[in-house]
Curated annotation (Swiss-Prot):
Its cofactor is Mg(2+). Substrate binds at T19, A20, S21, G22, K23, T24. Catalyzes the transfer of a dimethylallyl group onto the adenine at position 37 in tRNAs that read codons beginning with uridine, leading to the formation of N6-(dimethylallyl)adenosine (i(6)A). InterPro entries: Dimethylallyltransferase, IPT, P-loop_NTPase. The record marks T108, R130 as: Interaction with substrate tRNA. Transmembrane segments: none annotated. Signal peptide: none annotated. The lineage of its organism: Bacteria, Pseudomonadati, Pseudomonadota, Gammaproteobacteria, Enterobacterales. It is an enzyme of class 2 (transferase). Monomer. This is tRNA dimethylallyltransferase. Belongs to the IPP transferase family.
Length: 313
């Protein structure tokens, strides 16, 4: 009688949460307690020269707990969820091969989802079709594009705001390339993550606490030279406000200030508001997440102990 061997999956840890929730501090503490190596899951931290406005781990934090997938790309270059999944899987394999546990920490929920569930078979971007859409938008307005999308993909049109040209263009582009709606294609599952994943979400129980942290951190960034950081990017000449890097919260608002569209006080106000809106979207994602252990960022020791207990069980 032959024995059926069950393959034991390697462990991985997800530490997710909204911006300014204390993820980095907890990840560094876990690095001192567990055989983990960190992988950043953040669509802003990938860019070089964008340190202050992204709250990128500083030299001290990086020396305590080196993060992979930080500073891997110039701000002029694109980076997709598919790129992240490929890079993250490679990093996870290397960490696991060294006998350690990958600890993935960040707030870009789309990246976590792509890694956990795999990617739907969406077609690659087509510059010609994208140009046609943008030409039509220039002539008729993005509202017309939104109406066209609603006729072929009402679910996506309901989700995407008429003033969001990037997502509108992509959703319509997918249909024009494939003949199928983005909604239909995203229901097709990709390759699941071959790891035993322990998932944690950290956030304050009181949203007002998070709002206060966000405001304090944004003002601290300004004190630390955020304006000069964005000015260096602005003066390069090859970057513009439609790039994903410059659309990052804080950077977009500072860019508008440097270009003379808004004054300084308005930049601060919009930057704080945009960061709060980002945090709200991140929390909304997490509330719909399955199999996640919630941690209170106001009780650091309890959060640390909870992770240690769950992972060691």
């Amino acid at each position: 009688m032959s024995e059926v061997k069950t393959q034991i999956k390697p462990k991985a840890i997800f530490l997710m949460g909204p911006t300014a929730s204390g993820k980095t501090a907890l990840a560094i503490a876990l690095r001192q307690k567990l055989p983990v190596d960190l992988i950043s899951v953040d669509s802003a931290l990938i860019y070089r020269g964008m340190d202050i406005g992204t709250a990128k781990p500083d030299e001290t934090e990086q020396s305590l707990a080196p993060h992979r997938l930080i500073d891997i790309l110039d701000p002029a270059l694109p980076y997709s969820a598919a790129d992240f999944r490929k890079d993250a899987l490679k990093a996870m394999e290397e960490i696991t091969a060294a006998g350690r546990i990958p600890l993935l920490v960040g707030g870009t929920m789309l990246y976590f989802k792509a890694l956990l569930e795999g990617l739907s078979p969406l077609p690659s971007a087509n510059p010609e079709i994208r140009a046609e859409i943008e030409k039509k938008a220039a002539e008729q307005g993005w509202e017309a594009i939104h109406q066209e999308l609603a006729s072929v993909d009402p679910v996506a049109a309901k989700r995407i705001h008429p003033n969001d040209p990037q997502r509108l263009s992509r959703a319509l582009e997918v249909y024009l390339i494939s003949g199928k709606s983005m909604t239909e294609l995203t229901q097709i599952s990709g390759e699941a993550l071959p790891y035993d994943v322990y998932q944690f979400a950290i956030a304050p129980k009181d949203r007002n606490v998070l709002h206060q942290r966000i405001e304090a951190r944004f003002k601290q960034m300004l004190t630390c030279g955020f304006e000069d950081e964005v000015k260096s990017l602005y003066q390069r000449g090859d970057l513009h406000e439609d790039l994903p890097s410059i659309r990052c919260v804080g950077y977009r608002q500072m860019w508008s200030y440097l270009s003379g569209e808004i004054d300084y006080d308005e930049m601060v106000y919009r930057g704080i508001c945009a960061t709060r809106q980002l945090a709200k979207r991140q929390i909304t994602w997490l509330r719909g997440w399955h199999d996640v252990h919630w941690l209170d960022s106001e009780d650091f020791e309890q959060s640390l102990n909870t992770v240690l207990q769950v992972v060691s069980a």
